[in-house]
Amino acid sequence: VREKKSLVEVSVEVLEKAGYEVIFPESKNKLCCGTPWESKGFFDIADAKSGELEEALLQASKQGEYPVLCDTSPCTHRMKRVMSEKLKLYEPVEFIHDHLLDKLELQKSRESLAFHITCTSTKMGLEEKFMTVARACTEQPVFPEEVGCCGFAGDKGFTQPEINTWALRNLKLQVDRLSAGYSNSRTCEIGLSRNSGIDYTSVMYLVRDAIKE
């Protein structure tokens, strides 16, 4: 059954079960980290957008007193590069590792589940934390071999899907008998799903499903 709840809804559900109060920045639907513009060379627009987001996050986090959870690793990677060091910025995997694993009682899945470590997760040095989160949620985590960058390349996977297909040419045979896959970037997950035969979603869904009731 395809998941009906959005990543935001699931994230709030998990955070509240861990005892957190969730605060959203004002005008959140108008905010953007600027990555889509930066990737196309529109650096002034990218910096203007990230500046707006930075201001809103500083206000919402009480000048960095509270940690900030972002929903994808590429956005978080840019934000860490260009925003104030006052902000404690996390993508899902590191936030789960640092702030949720010790607050939630998890029941490991007995199924073999696939995991994809995104390029920006690697750049941020999150491989070990990714593996720790995976092992906390399933007895049989699978990190496919010879699958590095997924080739979605920001939004190029929408317009040049052949790049994505070539980058993931070794994926399907390794995961098509598995029940699901998990990562921390929605565009990567779209390409992974399209080229693997299984559905990839955010690791936050996996944690939600692993919480003991």
Q: Where do the protein language model's features map onto the residues?
A:
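Iron-sulfur cluster-binding electron-transfer modules in prokaryotic oxidoreductases
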Residues: 1-213
